[in-house]
Amino acid sequence: MDKFRMIFQFLQSNQESFMNGICGIMALASAQMYSAFDFNCPCLPGYNVVYSLGILLTPPLVLFLLGLVMNNNISMLAEEWKRPAGRRAKDPAVLRYMFCSMAQRALIAPVVWVAVTLLDGKCFLCAFCTAVPVATLGNGSLVPGLPAPELARLLARVPCPEIYDGNWLLAREVAVRYLRCISQALGWSFVLLTTLLAFVVRSVRPCFTQVAFLKSKYWSHYIDIERKLFDETCTEHAKAFAKVCIQQFFEAMNHDLELGHTHGVLATATATATATEAVQSPSDRTEEEREKLRGITDQGTMNRLLTSWHKCKPPLRLGQEAPLMSNGWAGGEPRPPRKEVATYFSKV
């Protein structure tokens, strides 16, 4: 158990490395899935293209959505995007940075699937077998005498060697080599293009927008850390709240048993009075528990606190916080907007 706890703590403290590892595992899994997939081209005109496009596009979409779902920050992004502005304005640049960071990792597995599919060539062969230039690669003198539907039917069977019967018009091996050559060229071009794009996004872009990049990165990390600390604080409060409630219940039951009362109205009133005294008495709780409760000792107050946190988060201005009024604004009314001027110096 200690080893698992250490691993879990390491993953929590190194979330970025953990997500990179998950993306790498998904990329390897996508390649393994394709190698284990039984590709069966229908070899029918009109159906080949639909089947091939489905194989080429549907699994990458599923892998992309899985990559987003497995990222813990997707809920944080949705919460930050949909929350009311309140006293803290929402920065679109931070939201874009958060989404781009998640999308870059989630796109790794789909890119691997598309690249492996194109390099293998089966999907491309099935989709474009009817577009082979028969006049150039085969017996072009026989093409004018064939109806278009018959020619399409013959070429659609090129991916299926067991039913292909058009060698008198076009050698199947010639068509397969021709289409696979084009597919592999497209595959390597796709790999090169995505590699260059990733290099530009990860390396070159921050050099031209360094200040904006640093600000977006900082506030993105701040939102993540703030949410984690809020969850930890709520968890500590819930544990302390539950502990005090259980202690009050047992103390009230013990008091009733000592007095010999039943669970009637009088016993309920006595238990309530005892519970109130237990909350207000510092001798029944340790100093740590009182600090975790932070003066919130009933359900209604906690619900109002959570509602206020969602609708009106505190401004990012330390040391100038005033108590909240009923409408969510400090001082009873909104403060007028102030123009802030910031100067950034870069030594790069």
UniProtKB/Swiss-Prot annotation:
Transmembrane domains' residue ranges: 21-36, 49-71, 99-124, 180-205
Main location: membrane
Residue intervals on the Extracellular side: 37-48, 125-179
Effect noted on mutating residue 234 to S: Decreases ATP release. Does not affect channel trafficking to the plasma membrane
Localization annotation: Cell membrane; Endoplasmic reticulum membrane; Basolateral cell membrane
Role summary: Pore-forming subunit of gustatory voltage-gated ion channels required for sensory perception of sweet, bitter and umami tastes. With CALHM3 forms a fast-activating voltage-gated ATP-release channel in type II taste bud cells, ATP acting as a neurotransmitter to activate afferent neural gustatory pathways. Acts both as a voltage-gated and calcium-activated ion channel: mediates neuronal excitability in response to membrane depolarization and low extracellular Ca(2+) concentration.
Name under which the protein is recorded: Calcium homeostasis modulator protein 1
Originating species: Mus musculus (Mouse)
Gene name linked to the record: Calhm1
